[in-house]
Amino acid sequence: MCVMNKFGFVAYLICAVLMFSSFDLQKCTDALQKAYEDKDYKAYVNAFPNKYEDFVNVYGYDSKNRQKKVLYDVYVEHLCFLFDDDLVLDDSVLDKLLNLSYNYIWDADAVEYVIMRTKQLLLEHPQRMTEYFSEKTDGEVTSFLQMALTCLIPEDQGYLSKYHKLVETYTPYSNRIVQCLKIALKRAKKASDALVVY
């Protein structure tokens, strides 16, 4: 009979949970690539990473080690596929973008592309985004907006004009979203100030 002490049992449980809940990079990249090649939007969204860290591990670039991530070379095609479909306005896709927004940090390439397209989505579809945000908490709305406002140089006039355009766009729709935009701008600036540029 095998006797396991409490510490051993707890360690076993932690390992088991991590093994079954951890992000499977290979499985994700294979599923994304297949869905993209098949032009299967729903399968692509299903396979799309749920966390910022996982997204970067799939489409990012490790500038410290000068190393491309698995799907770095196809990030433009893949992300165009995600954003160019009318289904990008479905809750399932917007929820994926919301999940990405937690701990979102500015970076070039794929990360910057998502920021740019999210901002465009907000500007072009205020009614739909207002409906979507009505079902979310202030914290969730602020996080989503902060992702769209994340940048390298927050004092840039082009950046500030986009922020003012968002405020102008959402003023007729929702005072709540305008207030969340103000909070998101402060947080995005604070996050940008903390960036270390190599």
Specify the residue positions occupied by each region the protein language model found.
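Compositionally biased regions
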Residues: 3, 22-23
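Extended alpha-helical scaffolding segments
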Residues: 91-96, 102-198
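Bacterial N-terminal signal peptides that target proteins for export
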Residues: 2-11
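Bacterial N-terminal signal peptides
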Residues: 11-19
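Cell wall/extracellular polymer interaction/catalysis modules
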Residues: 86-88
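Terminal domain-start segments
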Residues: 24-84, 177
